[in-house]
């Protein structure tokens, strides 16, 4: 039932978007979706795919879709952020987008709240991307459930000011370095 709500909301918002802005899929270089899981978003892409689009355009939209789901396949569902993780995945894993290209975006939330909107790539956007992120994701170390639970349930000893210092995270890019008044503070690890 939830899958059908997702797809019905996509169809409704896409039709309304087309009506308001007089745009079709041919106007977009890519479509990014809220990704509870990639197969549902793929069904969505197929649901809105215009049968009259040239095969070359259909292939490009499919290629960009495949690039947009790479991070979600590694990370899993991050709920609200999944659309933007998909956008980041697309931008960092393609070489066929350029400034001026339009990207359609479909946001969906529980309760059948949905929105269809678009963005346009600006000059210089590539400077903000990490083209090696997929490689970094592939280099992660799997934790056993026991090791994960050990870290997750670890008690933090707070001092009398509700603060704590941390060490031992020197091999990571970012680390929890302290807690001050119940606020976690993270920092980029200088290597």
Where is each model-derived feature located?
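Terminal domain-initiation and capping elements
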Residues: 1-191
